[in-house]
């Protein structure tokens, strides 16, 4: 009697193993992708970054002594004169005044880092520089490489310099909120966290996940933001809602308070310029655009556009929500299109389900001359982690450029397909599953693998950053963190990294 029972058990186990192996056979063929073949921006300024760090080390012992204070005052005054010069007339993007202003902002970084008492003035300088450059850009062709490079160096570069200083702030005085331009608007409004928010405003943010870092860093002009949402303010109640698209839920409407309660490392408020011809003709146009987005979200289910196809509005990624709404009213946002051109990065993203690499990236909306920056909020407590996530992602993408494939263990595919089946079932019931609606199990496992590798490298970088601070007495700047991350890649992925990523995914 025992032999037949043993035989049945062995046959059952053998059948299960065979079935598991059959489910481990990949079904997806090679992805058809569209490469825009643009040039990826590169700073190529490593010597400058380490020179600035050496200068900071030299200035730290002086702190805010009278000589240092006088030097800072003179440098700030010189920079403010340059900002006024920029605002005094029309300039071409290649004008020398912009290079001088960029050099001044970077040179001030070590000085303010060593004497943070003037941090508030440095924040105002960087904010005023951004506003002046954006005013100049109203006359520029933002699709020209020279224009994109100039705006990027001053806006992204200025923010990077400022945040390095903020991280070294020994006084703990770095403010979370930096107000910029109070662009006039006639649409309904509300106030939250010290900022007046109008209907039709755009909220550009950075999430706390690994994929958020990939979205921010992965395009031809690496950025700071990973998500865009649109604000609707009810004209009767002044209650604000946010219309946004997320990978698992698609397009949805949330109260503004719920939006802010979700993990946000930074948020920037953008508003259309009041002097745009379309807004002069109809000052309520932004509110009408918000109403269009709100109606679309409430009347039909719009899944997330995983392929990033700009022309498919039956599915929408986050940027398409405001873009499509404003487009219906004659406002075409993202005057400068975003591109991802590096073959290695394209290979990784295509493994995650992306098929189109010319799109509307959240970070690039800041460079659109049609919008003003109203305010920028950073979480001071997570700013360092934001930078760590960036350098880990950048190091991983450098591996991608050296033909390092993004893979996962073959035996995980059956499990991924079971989770996908569960996700399809709960989507049919009107709920969100762990795998987005249009994402395959194979793509989901590539995402999980990216998250797991990121988690493993990040752990090593953080350990090295602690050693650096103990050794040098200050927080490792981003270029040092990137060095740590680069040295931490290429190791075998640990099961602990997979489990940590899986917990976050579920």
Residue ranges and their predicted role:
Residues 2-506:
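Cysteine-nucleophile amide-bond enzymes
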């Amino acid at each position: 009697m025992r032999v037949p029972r043993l035989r049945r058990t062995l046959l059952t186990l053998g059948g299960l193993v065979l079935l598991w192996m059959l489910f481990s056979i990949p079904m997806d063929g090679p992805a058809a992708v569209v490469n825009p073949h643009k040039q990826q921006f590169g700073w190529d300024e490593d010597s400058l970054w380490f020179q600035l760090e050496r200068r900071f080390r030299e200035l730290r012992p002086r702190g805010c002594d009278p000589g240092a204070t006088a030097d800072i005052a003179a440098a700030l005054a010189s920079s403010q004169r340059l900002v006024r010069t920029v605002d005094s007339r029309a300039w071409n993007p290649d004008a020398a005044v912009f290079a001088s202003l960029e050099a001044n902002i970077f040179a001030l970084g070590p000085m303010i880092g060593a004497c943070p008492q003037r941090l508030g003035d440095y924040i105002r300088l960087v904010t005023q520089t951004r506003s002046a450059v954006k005013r100049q850009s109203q006359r520029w062709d933002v699709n020209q490489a020279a224009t994109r490079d100039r705006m990027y160096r001053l806006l992204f570069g200025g923010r990077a310099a400022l945040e390095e200083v903020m991280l070294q702030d020994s006084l703990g005085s770095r403010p979370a909120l930096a107000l910029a331009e109070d662009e006039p608007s006639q649409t309904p409004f509300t106030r939250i966290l010290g900022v007046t928010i109008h209907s039709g405003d755009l909220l550009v943010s950075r999430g706390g996940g690994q994929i958020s870092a990939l979205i921010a860093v992965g395009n031809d002009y690496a950025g700071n933001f990973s998500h865009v949402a649109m604000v609707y303010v009810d004209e009767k109640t002044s209650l604000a809602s946010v219309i946004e698209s997320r990978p698992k839920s698609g397009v949805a409407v949330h109260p503004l308070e719920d939006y802010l309660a979700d993990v946000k490392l930074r948020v920037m408020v953008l508003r259309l310029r009041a002097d745009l011809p379309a807004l002069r003709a109809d000052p309520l146009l932004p509110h009408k655009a918000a109403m269009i987005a709100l109606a679309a979200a409430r009347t039909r289910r719009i899944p997330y556009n995983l392929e990033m196809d700009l022309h498919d509005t039956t599915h929408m990624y986050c940027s398409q929500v405001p873009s499509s709404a404003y487009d219906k009213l004659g406002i075409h946002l993202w005057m400068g299109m975003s591109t991802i051109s590096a073959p290695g990065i394209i290979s990784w993203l295509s493994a995650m389900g992306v098929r189109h690499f010319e799109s509307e990236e959240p970070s690039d909306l800041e460079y659109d001359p049609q919008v003003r920056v109203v305010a920028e909020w950073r979480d001071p407590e997570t700013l360092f982690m934001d930078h760590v996530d960036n350098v880990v992602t950048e190091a991983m993408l450098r591996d991608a450029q050296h033909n390092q494939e993004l893979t996962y263990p073959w035996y995980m595919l059956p499990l991924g397909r079971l989770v996908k089946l569960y996700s399809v079932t709960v989507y049919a019931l009107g709920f969100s599953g762990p795998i987005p609606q249009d994402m395959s199990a194979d793509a989901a496992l590539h995402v999980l693998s990216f998250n797991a590798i990121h988690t493993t490298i990040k752990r090593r970088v953080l350990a090295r950053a602690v050693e650096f601070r103990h050794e040098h007495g200050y927080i490792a700047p981003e270029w040092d963190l990137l060095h740590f991350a680069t040295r931490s890649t290429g190791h075998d992925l640990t099961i602990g990294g997979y489990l940590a990523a899986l917990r976050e995914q579920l």
